[in-house]
Amino acid sequence: MQTETIHNIPYVNSNLTSFIDYLEKHYIDQKIGAVISTVNPEIAFAAIKDRDYFDVLSSSNFILPDGIGVVMMSRLTNNRLQSRIAGYDVFKELLGVANKKKKRIFLYGAKKDVIKGVVSKISSEYPNIKIAGYSDGYVQDRTLVAKQIARANPDMVFVALGYPHQEKFIHNYRHLFPKAVSIGLGGSFDVFSGNVKRAPSWMIRLNLEWFYRLILNPWRWKRMLSIPKYALTVLKEEKNKKTFYPKPEKDHTKQI
């Protein structure tokens, strides 16, 4: 699948429908495992500051531009990503695929009441999905959860621990469920369960979902400061024509 690279992070250059079709045909149907990371400017800037985290993201099979800021920066640096591919939308599309093909899934993350709400909604709306197991995100022993996932033998693993924890968890334990398609989903479980409202469709169309989140959670303004820092870093890099890290060789076994 075509990618476009922004400060050494190769983003999928596609749209939601085409990406899901590709994933279904080349990975899910073939029972080939894959790791999907969803990256917004905040996460990209975290990778700039943390080499270990950068290496974790780089080990992913697919890195999705989950943030209009990433798409905008691509256009300023002549990379031209087609569109934002939101993790929440990928989650719902994959549930549709799992329901159509009677796949097994494992859900990991969020609070106990939230994960139970997610399980209940999936059971109701996607009756052909086999929920092979689930765990809230507050279990202290993550190795125990990873072994639970391995025993469940799922086709898809959805991890909602927030960055960088979800990406590191998948990176560190993917060898225990190598045939599963695994994805980090941030706060998607909260939205799916109804505990948190997603932005209205018109705001999503206008790429204002970030602003809606800021209105609901004013404390996020400090996190938003990473966006201009990210932009300045990328533009400076483009001007100097250099990358902040050399491209690493993928090592799926290194523990982070």
From Swiss-Prot:
Recorded catalytic activity of this chain's protein: UDP-N-acetyl-alpha-D-mannosamine + N-acetyl-alpha-D-glucosaminyl-di-trans,octa-cis-undecaprenyl diphosphate = N-acetyl-beta-D-mannosaminyl-(1->4)-N-acetyl-alpha-D-glucosaminyl di-trans,octa-cis-undecaprenyl diphosphate + UDP + H(+)
A Gene Ontology biological process term: teichoic acid biosynthetic process
EC number: 2.4.1.187
Induction: Positively regulated by WalR. Mainly expressed during exponential growth and rapidly shut off as cells enter the stationary phase.
Gene Ontology terms for molecular function: hexosyltransferase activity; N-acetylglucosaminyldiphosphoundecaprenol N-acetyl-beta-D-mannosaminyltransferase activity
Effect of pH on activity: Optimum pH is 7-7.5.
Enzyme class: transferase
Swiss-Prot/TrEMBL keywords: Cell wall biogenesis/degradation, Glycosyltransferase, Teichoic acid biosynthesis, Transferase
Null mutant phenotype: Not essential. Impaired growth. Looses rod shape of cells. No teichoic acid in cell walls.
Pathway in which the depicted protein is active: Cell wall biogenesis; poly(glycerol phosphate) teichoic acid biosynthesis
Role noted for this protein: Catalyzes the conversion of GlcNAc-PP-undecaprenol into ManNAc-GlcNAc-PP-undecaprenol, the first committed lipid intermediate in the de novo synthesis of teichoic acid.
Family: Belongs to the glycosyltransferase 26 family. TagA/TarA subfamily.
Protein name, UniProt field: N-acetylglucosaminyldiphosphoundecaprenol N-acetyl-beta-D-mannosaminyltransferase
Source organism of this protein record: Bacillus subtilis (strain 168)
